[in-house]
């Protein structure tokens, strides 16, 4: 699947819950529905699950990305959409594209050129109940959990130049280490 969104540093996606405790009214598992209508948040979900599925292991998201800037970031949240409609984040990962190949040798994007990107969402163990949906949110910000970035090669928290990035991507795969109940 291919989608496009625009990231604007002056209007970052707000952090809703999660594993940070400072500066947030709510932390821990918080419903993500308030951010789903944003044009810079893309939401994918499965059909309702006919049986429970347990996911246990390390979660990675493989994307093919492009941008009209030399750097941008991706944030992905693996969530459960409950039968009630609540969307709860189970694990989250983020990566500034500059570091997609190496932390020690940053490499800019070539504007308009496709590049593979793997987002590590970390280890998790959870059971998605029958009737729920596996869902995925993709965006470029999660403030204040991660610092907004300028879409340039500048150091974090440096905003001498700010570029709005238009970012197409294709979701290649989200391999889930799953146990499907029979």
Report each predicted region and the residues it spans.
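C-terminal, loop-rich substrate-recognition/catalytic regions characterized by aromatic stacking residues
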Residues: 1-182
């Amino acid at each position: 699947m291919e989608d496009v969104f625009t990231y604007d540093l002056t209007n970052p996606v707000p952090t809703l819950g999660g594993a940070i405790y400072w500066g947030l009214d709510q932390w821990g598992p918080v419903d993500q529905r308030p951010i789903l209508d944003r044009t810079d948040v893309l939401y994918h979900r499965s059909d309702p699950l006919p049986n429970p599925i347990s996911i246990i292991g390390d979660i990675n998201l493989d994307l093919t990305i492009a941008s009209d800037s030399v750097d941008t970031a991706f944030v992905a949240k693996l969530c459960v959409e409950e039968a009630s409609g609540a969307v709860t984040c189970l694990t989250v990962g983020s990566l500034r594209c500059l570091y997609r190949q190496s932390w020690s040798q940053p490499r800019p994007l070539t504007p308009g050129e496709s590049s593979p990107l793997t987002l590590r969402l970390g280890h998790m163990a959870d059971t998605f109940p029958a009737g729920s949906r596996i869902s995925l949110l993709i965006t470029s910000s999660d403030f204040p959990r991660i610092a907004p970035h300028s879409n340039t090669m500048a150091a974090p928290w440096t905003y001498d130049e700010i570029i709005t990035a238009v970012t197409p991507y294709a979701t290649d795969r989200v391999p889930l280490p799953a146990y499907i109940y029979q």
